[in-house]
Each structure stands twice: as C-alpha cells, then as structure tokens.
From Swiss-Prot:
Name of the protein in its database record: Large ribosomal subunit protein uL10
Gene3D superfamilies referenced in this protein's UniProt entry, alphabetically: 3.30.70.1730
Similarity comment: Belongs to the universal ribosomal protein uL10 family.
Keyword RNA-binding: yes
A single cellular component GO annotation: ribosome
HAMAP family with a match to the protein in the record: Ribosomal_uL10
GO-annotated molecular function: large ribosomal subunit rRNA binding
GO BP annotations, alphabetical order: translation
Encoding gene per record: rplJ
Organism (species): Pelagibacter ubique (strain HTCC1062)
Signal peptide segment: none
Membrane spanning residue stretches: none
Free-text function comment from the UniProt entry: Forms part of the ribosomal stalk, playing a central role in the interaction of the ribosome with GTP-bound translation factors.
Subunit structure, as described in the record: Part of the ribosomal stalk of the 50S ribosomal subunit. The N-terminus interacts with L11 and the large rRNA to form the base of the stalk. The C-terminus forms an elongated spine to which L12 dimers bind in a sequential fashion forming a multimeric L10(L12)X complex.
Record keywords, A-Z: Ribonucleoprotein, Ribosomal protein, RNA-binding, rRNA-binding
C-alpha cells in the first residue's frame, strides 16, 4: 500500500468510526472465505458494513475518533462491523460466533459507551426497537382487552337475568 492509499484508508476509517453509532470489533482467525462471505452477506442485509482491517493503520485512524479506547483490540486478524444499530450487529455477530467458533467478539462502542465482550453479548440479547414497541403495545392492550371481556361477561349475565329471556 503506497502513501496515498494509506492516507485514503485512514480517512475512510476515521469517517466510519465517527459516523456510525455502533462499532463491533472481532477476530476472525480460522474462518474460511466462504464463512466470511456468508457473514458479510448477513450483515449487508441489515445495512451493516463488515470489513477486515489493517491494524497498524487503523490504530492511527482511531486516534482522532470517539473510538480511540478500542485501539488495544486491534491485534491479529481483526474485522470491524460498522452500523447505526448496535443490537442488530451484536445479534448477528453473536449468532454467527455460536456456530463458527473461529469468530471472536472482542468489544465495541455503542454511542459513546465502550463495550467489553460481555457487554456486547448483553446488547445482543436486548430487544430491537421494533420488538420493544410491539411488547409495549401488547402490555398496553392487555388491560383494555380484559376490561372489554369483563364488561361483555357482565352484560351477558345481565341479559340472561332479564325477565324477557324467561
């Protein structure tokens, strides 16, 4: 990689680290190309960019970003997932890591919060915004449906007691 390419790479990585709400760092040592392609395809379906990094140059790019605390994770065969939805990216990586032990989740950033490996797993178990909304609607609808059932049962009982039905 010549000097100009390195400058472009650093600039692109700085932009990715600054403009994405979620950054997940992984080690992929031992994954085959077909496994990497499969993971990339899953990520791409959700608008997540998954890229293999050049560690030394990436560390230079990290120095000027909110993600500089992740610098120590960039050793060995490292790849990064950039997205605006930490839950989806953590879920995909976590699920893939369960079936492909060569993929290791190292940590990441969600907003301005640094995540360690355990925190990434916790994020993967959180409901997405749509799932949380559906749960909330279900919780709010339950009392109303119970009230309707009680009122209907009461009206049926009242109508069966009326003299017209005798």
């Amino acid at each position: 990689m010549n000097k100009e390419q390195k400058k472009n790479y650093i600039s692109e990585m700085e932009t990715q680290f600054q403009n994405n709400e979620a950054v997940m760092v992984t080690h992929y040592q031992g994954l085959t190309m077909s496994q990497l392609d499969e993971l990339r395809a899953q990520m791409r379906e959700h608008g997540i960019k998954f890229t293999i990094t050049k560690n030394r140059i990436t560390k230079i790019a990290l120095e000027k970003t909110k993600c500089k605390e992740l610098s120590n994770l960039f050793t060995g065969a490292t790849a990064v997932a950039f997205s605006n939805d930490a839950i989806i990216s953590a879920r995909i990586l976590s699920k893939f890591a369960k079936t492909n032990e060569s993929l290791k989740l190292l940590g990441g950033i969600m907003g301005n919060e640094v995540l360690d490996q355990a925190a990434v797993q916790n994020v993967a178990n959180l409901p997405t915004l749509d799932e949380a909304r559906a749960n909330l609607v279900g919780i709010l609808a339950t009392p109303a449906s119970k009230l309707v059932s009680i009122l209907l049962a009461r009206s049926e009982k009242m109508s069966s007691l009326s003299p017209e039905n005798s």
